[in-house]
A protein has these predicted regions:
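Extended, solvent-exposed polar beta/coil surface segments
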Residues: 1, 658-660
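P-loop NTPase Walker
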Residues: 1-33, 40, 184-303
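Extended, charged low-complexity regulatory segments
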Residues: 1-200, 204, 208-212
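Generic detector of solvent-exposed, compositionally biased contiguous segments
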Residues: 54-73, 211-217, 222-224, 228-231, ...
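Short, charged/polar micro-motifs that form catalytic or ligand-binding hotspots
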Residues: 79, 83, 189, 193, ...
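Short, well-ordered alpha-helical scaffold segments within catalytic/effector domains
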Residues: 196-200, 204-208, 234, 238, ...
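Alpha-helical nucleic-acid-binding subdomain
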Residues: 241-470, 476-484, 492
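Conserved helicase motor core of SF1/SF2 NTP-dependent helicases
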Residues: 246, 260-276, 281-286, 292-302, ...
């Protein structure tokens, strides 16, 4: 195979590969059409010949099934070809085996293998193929991979990465390390000097340590703003899918993300994942399902909105207490108190002649103390009936079993989760810490402790199907929420976020708090901020300082602070900035307001000027490029090429400063 060395040669090669893919697509389309026509011919023949003998029917059935299977295979091939047409590959290594006479083999790596039947060669190797492992596992120099015939050793003499979109190469880079982040790739592609190359190499080594960490059962990543933590976490998923492909697939991984928009936003970050989508859910959905969707509750978004608006100190105090470890400790003590005080055994008259004495029932309650409270009733019922059967030759019916179970359940004073939860606050002497909203709606901060109490009484509903759990925006979840996650998901976990980016400072968690909640976990820190320019990072540091953040000298324009006399002139200024954005060539502009109500009002105002403005609300389910107006809560975790933050001092409450926004 020809060794393409220059960027121009690589561009020519790319177009040659795309041309061959297009030819293959044309041939595949023809093959699909032929299979459809053949199946239709069989169908027509059967309909027009009613007197077909059984032997011919069996023969035709075999032929139809074969054609159907082949057709499905061809359709699947066509689908894969369609996927690689826009981005045929993203990496290349040149590899030479150690055996004598071996030639250097250029290996192009993409989301699917592509074999050219004309040249009888693999033009693209699947990123999961054994030979592709050297792209991820080795720098330049000696390398090995395990093939079906054994271990192959040799030398990697070249490593390249490409940014290809819609069949066009935007840039390529050469680096001994595999650089995962697009912004770092761009820096290297822009003829970066040795200093920047060293910085990028350092960042990539730090990221690789996280991506390839297979030892930690719980990996907690504390990353400052702009450190690329979300991208790293998703590449970690790709790496785990590759290295553990015999044990884990995409359906075995679950992502907990803050909202539907964020889930959609990250879904296209990894071309390496190919067609494998990873299931996503939210913390609210998990907690509500534990409680069997019985309760109406305030969403996290609604809680944040209330905190940003007019709220009471008592509301804040309720959130703060229920986000503390003292709260968890008291709840555990109360569950133990229930164990000793909520079960009052009574005699049960099973038949006219058989009565089970209360002391015997109480003894069995203690006997089965290894079971959660309500599971214990099942075990007690079965055991007591078995004893009656042995002692009295009693024939047990379903009605007898149901009666005894019902009577035992009545002896327990904790059958109503919500009532028990309310009694807990009376038990600790602070009944005012529990308050239902209008229409008996639970406050968001009560959802997790109620689920925790439910699991403690009913037993864990262990989600064994999930083999790896990824939690993003870790700071937005409280310790009690992590305790529920611990009960539900015993699997390995990757948890990431930034303690300084919480939208609810009263109910947030640091990496240390999360580690304490799980009683284990390895914490890894990312302090280098590179996804924003030095000027933007420096500007943000002046508003709210983060002493752990290390800005990278990637320069750009200084942020502008514009002053307006009133909101009308502010809107006019925003319209001018939108006009400049349209001419800039950038793809996304985020206009971020403090609350959703303010964002909606501004979006409606701007939409009279241009229909291209999109309002991203809590109800939105997809992230779109272009001009987006949204709230600070919804914008968290998203990235924009340009951003506008309208700050009207009429929106600031008396005690607030700019840093609170």
């Amino acid at each position: 195979m020809t060794l393409y060395q220059t960027e121009q040669q690589e561009r020519v090669h790319l177009q040659q590969v795309i041309s061959i893919i297009n030819d293959t697509i044309h041939n595949t389309d023809t093959s699909v059409k032929e299979h459809v026509e053949t199946l239709q011919e069989y169908k027509d023949y059967i309909w027009s010949n009613k007197d077909i003998d059984p032997h011919e029917i069996r023969s035709m059935r075999e032929s139809i099934l074969n054609h159907f299977a082949l057709g499905e295979s061809v359709i699947d091939k066509r689908r894969r070809l369609g996927r690689i047409l826009d981005i045929p590959y993203f990496g290349r290594i040149d590899f030479k085996e150690k055996k004598n006479g071996a030639n250097i083999l250029p290996i192009y790596i993409g989301i699917h293998t592509f074999y050219d039947s004309q040249s009888k060669m693999n033009l693209i190797y699947d990123w999961r193929a054994p030979i592709s492992s050297m792209f991820y596992d080795y720098e330049l120099g000696e390398a090995t991979y395990t093939s079906p015939v054994g271990e192959i050793s040799g030398d990697v003499s070249l490593k390249r990465q490409y940014r290809i979109r819609k069949g066009k190469m935007e840039y390529m880079i050469e680096s001994s390390l595999t650089v995962h982040d697009e912004i770092l790739q761009k820096e290297l592609s822009n003829n970066a000097d040795d200093k920047m190359r060293n910085i990028v190499t350092t960042i990539q080594r730090e990221q690789n340590r996280i991506i390839r960490n297979e030892e930690a059962h719980i990996l907690i990543i504390q990353g400052v703003a702009g450190s690329g933590k979300t991208s790293i976490a998703l590449h970690r998923i790709a790496y785990l899918l590759y290295t553990l492909k015999e044990d884990i697939s995409s359906k075995d991984i679950l992502i907990i993300s803050p909202n539907k928009v964020f889930g959609d936003y990250i879904s296209n970050v990894l071309p390496e994942l190919g067609e494998e989508s990873v299931p996503e859910t939210s913390m609210e959905q998990i907690l509500s399902e534990v409680l069997e969707n019985k309760y109406k509750y305030q969403s996290f978004f609604e809680q944040v909105t209330e905190l940003l608006g007019k709220t009471t100190q008592s509301f804040i105090e309720r959130i703060k207490y229920k986000s503390s470890f003292d709260f968890i400790s008291q709840l555990d003590k109360f569950i133990l108190f229930m164990e000793n005080n909520y079960f009052k055994a009574t005699d049960v008259k099973l038949t006219r002649h058989i009565t089970i004495p209360s002391e015997y029932i109480k003894e069995q309650f203690r006997r089965f103390n290894r079971y959660p409270m309500r599971q214990r009733f099942e075990a007690m019922t079965d055991y007591l009936l078995e004893m009656m059967k042995v002692q009295y030759y009693f024939t047990v019916t379903t009605a007898d079993r149901n009666l005894l179970k019902k009577e035992i359940k009545k002896m327990f004073a904790g059958n109503n989760d919500l009532q028990v939860y309310k009694e807990f606050f009376e038990w600790i002497g602070n009944p005012e810490l529990f308050k239902l909203q209008k229409n008996r709606i639970l406050e968001y901060t009560d959802l997790a402790p109620l689920a925790y109490l439910h699991l403690s009484l009913y037993g864990n509903i262990t989600q064994c199907r999930v083999k790896h759990l990824l939690i993003d925006e870790m700071q937005d979840y409280s310790p009690i929420q992590y305790k529920v996650i611990q009960k539900l998901y015993p699997c390995r976990k990757t948890i990431l976020g930034d303690a300084s980016q919480s939208v609810n400072p009263y109910g947030s968690s640091t990496a240390g708090m999360i580690r304490k909640a799980f009683t284990m976990g390895e914490v890894m820190k990312l302090c280098k901020s590179y996804r924003s320019t030095f000027e933007i990072t420096d500007f943000a540091q002046k508003i709210q300082t983060n002493n752990e953040l290390e800005p990278i000298m990637r320069h750009g324009e200084f942020p502008s602070v514009l002053q307006f006399e009133n909101t009308e002139k502010e809107s006019s200024g925003i319209i001018d900035l939108i006009s400049s954005f349209k001419k800039s060539g950038y793809k996304s502009l985020g206009i971020v307001c403090k609350t959703e109500a303010q964002a909606k009002e501004l979006a409606e105002s701007l939409q009279t000027y241009t229909a291209e403005v999109y309002f991203l609300s809590n109800q939105s389910s997809a992230f779109v490029k272009g001009i987006i107006v949204t709230s600070s809560h919804m914008a968290k975790g998203l990235e924009f090429d340009e951003a506008i933050i309208p700050v009207s001092y009429t929106h600031l409450r008396a005690h607030e400063t700019l840093s609170d926004l």
